[in-house]
Amino acid sequence: MIKITLKDGSVREYAVGTTVLEVAKSISQGLAREALAGKVNGKIVDLEYPLKEDAALELLTFNDEEGKTVYRHSTAHVLAQAVKRLFPDAKLAIGPAIQDGYYYDFDVEQPFTPAQLERIEEEMNKIIKEDIPFKRVELSREEALEHFKKQDEIYKIELITDLPEDAVISCYQQGDFDDLCAGPHVPSTGRLKSLKLMSIAGAYWRGSEKNKMLQRIYGTSFPKKAMLDEHLFRIEEAKRRDHRKLGQELDLFSIQEEGPGFPFFHPKGMVLRNELENFWRQEHKKRGYQEIRTPIILNRSMWEQSGHWAHYKDNMYFTKIDEADYAVKPMNCPGSILVYKTRMHSYRDLPLRWGELGLVHRHELSGALHGLMRVRCFTQDDAHIFMLPSQIKDEIIGVIDLFDYFYNTFGLNYHVELSTRPEKSMGSDEMWEVATNSLRDALEAKKMDYKVNEGDGAFYGPKIDFHLTDSLGRTWQCGTIQLDFQMPERFNLNYVGEDGQKHRPVMIHRVVFGSIERFIGILTEHFAGAFPVWLAPVQVKVLPITDRHHEYARELVKRLQGLDIRVELDARNEKINYKIREAQTQKIPYMLVIGDREMEQGAVAVRERGKGDVGAISVGDFIKKIEDDIQNKTI
């Protein structure tokens, strides 16, 4: 007998060779129906996997992220089988599960058409109804190569050739179809219920422009139709909220052919941007930060010393000045370090908290660019804290408190991940252990739930990542706290301690917004362009009904402008309903309609965004209301 420890901590005994599915059945038939795969000692396996020794077992359902991955990866195999049935000459490339769905890449003579996509989806549903079992078969390298050579699957042959010598090579069969795959998969195609093919796109084999362009079919799948319908609704809502679309409609920013990946901010977009930067400056000043500014271009020797030349060169832009090599900065931290080195510091000076709204440039492939979300130049709201080792915990807690205040101000929930040492890194094991434990201690002191993200730290230190959740339930990684023992060592940073001797400071790198451009994109989609009053590029639109109301309207505009309220006057000879509709389209928080009665009473008829007509009030009362909204940053 073997002992199996379940997720709830309970231990059950089973015969050697009992499968994961049999364990699920022994717990309940309902769980057996819901289970998609198992997780044995951290490894995800098929339900038919035999248990041969004591192990920890977690049964994965669609409620688990790993369960969703298995479900959608299996659907990708059904997609490949359907395409091969309908287009036998199609060559198979790869078909992974991705966030909210899956895709499969095919090499075909002609691009797929929308009509063909419908036929493929129909064929997939037939395959699901056939309830074909997924069967895992392990092959030697020679057997696998021979098998796929017979099928003339050139991409599978290339993948097999590139596998390590000791790799276990497996295929998954479903009827007369099979595919190279490590798995795992659901027991049979009948376990897959509701699916939808979403789109077709071109994709280079292995992501390289040097390789052939393939046809990529994107899809999604869910165990219930209601879940699929909800997902499709969210997608349509996301299209409506797309920051690229709203950025154009609201005249916030543009991306020009002359500068792909380099955003152009228009006057209204600059208002939004400046409000965010002002908020950032005010809150940092309250917490003892000082602002610095460092150059965009620095010489090669500095980037070699920082480690960026060795670890980050592929993402950097370069130039020459007087025949010497220079690079455009991809990060702000080396500049801050150089400022620190301009004078000797005492332990009494620390912690030093320096913030910088620094413009950085990073090379991105053209295919990866996406509005403000993925650009080649952006403003990083960096701050660097130089401190004593004894101050680490308190400083990290202070940064966490700042982040919490910022995100709550925008109505954004978040979850936290602790990212540990990546494969490509610098520094000793001991330094990494101390740094990682320091971050963990601060999170636990704040009683924060967090997930460990193994191997995703920066090359110079571990980090805490803050993932924001927007109004559509999507997550965005924005805030980061990185603890760094490496840079102070590489740049020979010192402070004079209480003992009169030189010591190494510890450094924190941190960003709240991450990228101001990207954060504007996130906020635009989160609020669907209907920004809170304090952020809105235009806060008030004054709408006189006829020409005789213009003078009163102009006086009102002048009064509001004197109070730093952002106001526009629509004095066009148009019907009032037309003016109202246009102001609504521009998502302006307040519309003030001026007619005879308002002139006589010294009042305004207020229309509030999302509420409509809320009645007439005195100008003084309206000013108090909007100033309260701005002061309190009402959402």
Curated annotation (Swiss-Prot):
Record's GO cellular component terms: cytoplasm
Catalytic activity: tRNA(Thr) + L-threonine + ATP = L-threonyl-tRNA(Thr) + AMP + diphosphate + H(+)
Entry EC number(s): 6.1.1.3
GO-annotated molecular function: ATP binding; catalytic activity, acting on a protein; metal ion binding; threonine-tRNA ligase activity; transferase activity; tRNA binding
Domain called TGS: residue spans: 1-61
SMART domains linked to this entry: tRNA_SAD (SM00863)
Biological processes annotated in GO: threonyl-tRNA aminoacylation
InterPro entries on file: aa-tRNA-synt_IIb, aa-tRNA-synth_II, aa-tRNA-synth_II/BPL/LPL, Anticodon-bd, Anticodon-bd_dom_sf, Beta-grasp_dom_sf, TGS, TGS-like
Residues at which Zn(2+) binds: C333, H384, H509
Cofactor: binding comment: Binds 1 zinc ion per subunit.
Region (Catalytic): 242-532
Cofactor: Zn(2+)
Subcellular location: Cytoplasm
Keywords assigned: Aminoacyl-tRNA synthetase, ATP-binding, Cytoplasm, Ligase, Metal-binding, Nucleotide-binding, Protein biosynthesis, RNA-binding, tRNA-binding, Zinc
Superkingdom per UniProt: Bacteria
HAMAP family in UniProt: Thr_tRNA_synth
Function: Catalyzes the attachment of threonine to tRNA(Thr) in a two-step reaction: L-threonine is first activated by ATP to form Thr-AMP and then transferred to the acceptor end of tRNA(Thr). Also edits incorrectly charged L-seryl-tRNA(Thr).
Binding partners and assembly: Homodimer.
Family note: Belongs to the class-II aminoacyl-tRNA synthetase family.
The protein's name in its UniProt record: Threonine--tRNA ligase
Organism of this sequence: Desulforamulus reducens (strain ATCC BAA-1160 / DSM 100696 / MI-1) (Desulfotomaculum reducens)
Gene symbol of the encoding locus: thrS
